[in-house]
From Swiss-Prot:
Binding site for ATP: 52-59
Pfam assignment, any one: ABC_tran
Compartments in which it is found: Cell inner membrane
Membrane topology reported for the UniProt record: Peripheral membrane protein
Keyword Nucleotide-binding: yes
Enzyme class per UniProt: translocase
Organism: Haemophilus ducreyi (strain 35000HP / ATCC 700724)
Keywords assigned: ATP-binding, Cell inner membrane, Cell membrane, Ion transport, Membrane, Nucleotide-binding, Translocase, Transport, Zinc, Zinc transport
A single GO molecular function term of this UniProt record: ATP binding
Protein name: Zinc import ATP-binding protein ZnuC
Catalytic activity: Zn(2+)(out) + ATP(in) + H2O(in) = Zn(2+)(in) + ADP(in) + phosphate(in) + H(+)(in)
Amino acid sequence: MQIKPLTPIDRSSKTSEILVQLKNIEVTFAEKQALQNINLTIYKNSITTIVGPNGGGKSTLLKVLLKLLKPSQGQVIHQPGLKIGYVPQKLHLDHSMPITVKKFLSLKPNCSTPSIAAALTLFSIEHLAQNSMQKLSGGELQRVLLARAILDRPQLLVLDEPMQGVDISGQTELYQLLTQTRTWLNCAIIMVSHDLNIVMANTDEVLCVNKHICCAGSPELVSNDPNFIHFFGDQFAKNVAFYSHRHNHHHNLHGDICKGKCEC
């Protein structure tokens, strides 16, 4: 049986349609501030990438956005009826209980056999349908997780390190698939990623997060910014052309904002 690919969704041509707003978000764990003064708007059909140092609050920010974590202060506003697809940073599979890809996808509530077949086709993994989840490569697993995330055709895809465990060629293919997915579903995508050399060619806006939003901008504005070099390192900046934005501050080694000249 030949499976037709997903039919593109025409929700609206408005690119200014707001899906999610975060207003004055703060998150504190045991008196330690994880996020402060976060203001963020996610628009329909946009791709936003969150970058920053380990421990800077990127995954915490996604959890707040998903309403999986209640902020200590601030508001999280979702468009009424917003459908969200989520790919977590890690998936823990019990190797004593093998499960096929098709069965794994079917565990998602209210999904149909045709929708599973269409998702497998979209991500070019039809041949993996009867394979064990536990035996998939990193790239194959990420494609399966993405296929599962779009089964109910979400308006927003939230991805936490979607390229983790995927080789360079696989990362390029996956980013192409994400761009294709945005076109088919007319959805927004927000992701956390460390793969900056590929990210910058495949995103509309970048947020640098280190407890707060240090800076935000489009990829093409950043390549020569001295603060970008300070944040990510001189050698990295020399090898890759990126977006330009402006910090009005620096961080010390503990992630705190420096007052005056920063010696870090």
